[in-house]
């Protein structure tokens, strides 16, 4: 009997040792200074397109990263660069990427435009998510300040009816436009308006739209991107045009983890209510505003559909199939 018990205990020990703890992504997700991460799922892979966080004059290309489990990431260098954008001079920022019928569209901000003719929001295309993306127009899609919104930080959102909208804007103003069927032009809304200002209270930059069920969650960044007070707030609406009344902050600094958590995107996993928030932050002790890294956390909702505040971590999220 004693021998049987011993064998059983040994079997349990072997079984316990063979159970590996879930791999975690860790934060940051990958090495290097990267900010403004756009996360999107293509097939069974998550792709992240960030800004290369360096001085403006050095920001002449973008890298991308892909993963099938949110833990192991492959770097794709220079998916877009100055060689394929004739009017790019500096400050290649905040990509937004979509796919339709096998073509990938990458929308970008360039040149930190302050006056008409200096730059603005452009669009590039490729037949592969790793690029190379090439400028599709030869000039900006939006090249002027309208309703006070600097043409940067664009996010393209497809609604359930097939319509594509672009939300964009810096300098504390946010506009919304409708894209044409070619996804490279702007067409008027049904009321004839072309640029709708939808700026919510507190808005600074970095708009993002998520539709969950029948609810539209409009999110944005507040504060200064170089400092510790950068954070993300949100609003809810029953339509993509708003109005968007600020509800509260969902992502912010933690003095024990990192500062300046903001400029995010959201992806959906396989589960019914499985969402992840991808964002940048400053490591503790960082002294340069460009010292920003890309991180990920789970995003949860309460029973009323409101977004619960996100706890930023060093651990990140467990490995998961997409």
Model-derived features: where do they sit?
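Sec-dependent signal peptide recognition
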Residues: 2-8
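Enrichment for repetitive, rod-forming helical segments
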Residues: 9-10, 288
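Hydrophobic h-region of N-terminal signal peptides that target proteins for export
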Residues: 10-17
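Carbohydrate-active catalytic/glycan-binding domains of CAZyme proteins
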Residues: 17-322
